[in-house]
């Protein structure tokens, strides 16, 4: 059971509500389109009406007035477990970390990842760079969330994770105040994952970190890292069975696999929900000397404005891809990051992989440009999904990133963000 939030919160009622429920979103997951506008079919994801959901969790979303000019969508979400949970979270690497990030990190450390009961999220106000008052507001949100389920006084303080997203530099008004900025190192992205599997608290942090490295830390929309990024996992063990306590156990490996695959699915949905996005693009770097180098190249291409605008314009400008590949390994002018050359131009190949299963369109082979069929290239770029393959021909490692294009709508959304 998951709730993801970008610039605005997307809420799905999966079990039963703990607060008022907004009927307009029943069964539908809303993506980045203004509430008053028609939502494109590609931006709608339907939640199944049947299935197996984790036991012992309550989830709800409601409107509380954080966004006074937009009363048509919820601005507060609440996920609670009926019993105390093991929990873990990964947070933004931005130096200006928001009050909810600081409060939640300290709470998890104080409780040693055990005894957590809920996650409370608001949209409309990031509560970032708000000083001492903002910290007090985040702590009040924790206290109010705890009060909803009569949390016992165990001397360890609050037991709720708090998340906020919205405008930076604005204070929250108690509990009721408070998908751009997406780039690795937990970048604005908020996510909650709930499981009823019995996982020892000490194991959850590494399980989540491993999953996030291959998912949320492998996506980029605009290259900006938010002050508020947080992904949390709660495990209440209600499903029963023997608790997973060993990293070498088969159950640990099985849970890691499922958690990672699930996180990848969620991360891809975040990219598809990119502000103004019209394309979902996979950047795959293969035959690299090192995984670190491959990730660096994929990341650089994924956040290149020239590559992203070319994709929006349906322009098979492979020179921009090659340019981003070439400068990806530069940390200081003229200095390679690694001693082993990651990129040998004479061995590098670039292709478009169509989403319809048709043969790849080779753009560059071993450093030599191909005679590109521009008509076929345009046909490939008409599709929403596209893979860009960069084969370095110099090793066995690979890396994958997911990104989207830059459109006119992206500029409009972010140009009018506060107005």
Swiss-Prot record:
Signal found in the keyword field: no
InterPro entries (UniProt xref): Arg_biosynth_ArgJ, ArgJ-like_dom_sf, ArgJ_beta_C
Catalysed reactions, semicolon-separated: N(2)-acetyl-L-ornithine + L-glutamate = N-acetyl-L-glutamate + L-ornithine; L-glutamate + acetyl-CoA = N-acetyl-L-glutamate + CoA + H(+)
A biological-process GO annotation: ornithine biosynthetic process
PTM field: The alpha and beta chains are autoproteolytically processed from a single precursor protein within the mitochondrion.
The protein's annotated pathway: Amino-acid biosynthesis; L-arginine biosynthesis; L-ornithine and N-acetyl-L-glutamate from L-glutamate and N(2)-acetyl-L-ornithine (cyclic): step 1/1; Amino-acid biosynthesis; L-arginine biosynthesis; N(2)-acetyl-L-ornithine from L-glutamate: step 1/4
EC number: 2.3.1.35, 2.3.1.1
UniProt binding sites for substrate: 177, 188, 275, 414, 419
Protein's cellular compartments: Mitochondrion matrix
GO molecular function: glutamate N-acetyltransferase activity; L-glutamate N-acetyltransferase activity
Marked site positions, Cleavage: 187-188
Record's GO cellular component terms: mitochondrial matrix
Family recorded in the similarity comment: Belongs to the ArgJ family.
Biological role: Catalyzes two activities which are involved in the cyclic version of arginine biosynthesis: the synthesis of acetylglutamate from glutamate and acetyl-CoA, and of ornithine by transacetylation between acetylornithine and glutamate.
Misc. comment: This protein may be expected to contain an N-terminal transit peptide but none has been predicted.
Protein name in the entry: Arginine biosynthesis bifunctional protein ArgJ 1, mitochondrial
């Amino acid at each position: 059971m998951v709730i993801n939030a970008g610039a605005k919160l997307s809420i799905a009622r999966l079990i039963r509500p703990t607060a008022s429920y907004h009927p307009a979103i029943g069964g539908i997951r809303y993506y980045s389109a203004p509430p008053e506008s028609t939502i494109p079919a590609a931006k709608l994801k339907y939640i199944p009406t049947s299935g197996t959901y984790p036991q012992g969790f309550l989830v709800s979303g409601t409107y509380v007035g954080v966004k006074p000019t937009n009363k048509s969508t919820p601005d507060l979400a609440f996920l609670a477990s009926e019993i105390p949970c093991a929990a873990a979270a990964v947070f933004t690497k931005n130096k200006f970390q928001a009050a909810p990030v600081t409060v939640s990190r300290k709470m998890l450390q104080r409780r040693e990842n055990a005894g957590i009961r809920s996650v409370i999220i608001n949209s409309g106000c990031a509560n970032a760079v708000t000083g001492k008052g903002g910290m007090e507001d985040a702590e009040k949100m924790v206290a109010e969330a705890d009060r909803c389920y009569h949390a016992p006084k165990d001397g360890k303080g609050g037991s709720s994770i708090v998340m906020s997203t919205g405008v930076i530099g604005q204070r929250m008004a108690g509990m009721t105040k408070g998908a751009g900025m997406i780039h690795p190192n937990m970048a604005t992205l908020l996510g909650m994952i709930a499981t009823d599997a019995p996982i020892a608290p000490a194991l959850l942090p590494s399980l989540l970190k491993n999953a996030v490295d291959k998912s949320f830390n492998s996506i980029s929309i605009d290259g900006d890292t938010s002050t508020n990024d947080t992904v949390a996992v709660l495990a209440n063990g209600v499903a029963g069975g023997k608790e997973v306590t060993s990293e070498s156990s088969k159950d640990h490996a099985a849970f890691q696999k499922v958690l990672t695959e699930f996180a990848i699915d969620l991360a891809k949905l975040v990219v598809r929900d990119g502000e103004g996005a019209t394309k979902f693009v996979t950047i795959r770097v293969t035959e690299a000397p090192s995984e670190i180098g491959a990730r660096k190249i994929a990341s650089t291409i994924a956040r290149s404005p020239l590559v992203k605008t070319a994709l929006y314009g349906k322009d098979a400008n492979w020179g921009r891809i090659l340019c981003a590949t070439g400068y990806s390994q530069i940390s200081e002018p003229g200095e390679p990051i690694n001693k082993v050359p990651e990129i040998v131009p004479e061995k590098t190949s670039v292709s478009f992989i169509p989403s319809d299963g048709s043969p790849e369109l080779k753009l560059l082979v071993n450093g030599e440009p191909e005679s590109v069929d521009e008509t076929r290239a345009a046909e490939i770029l008409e599709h929403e999904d596209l893979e860009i393959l960069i084969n370095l021909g110099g090793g066995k490692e690979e890396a994958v990133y997911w990104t989207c294009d830059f459109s006119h709508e992206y500029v409009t959304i972010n140009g009018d963000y506060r107005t």
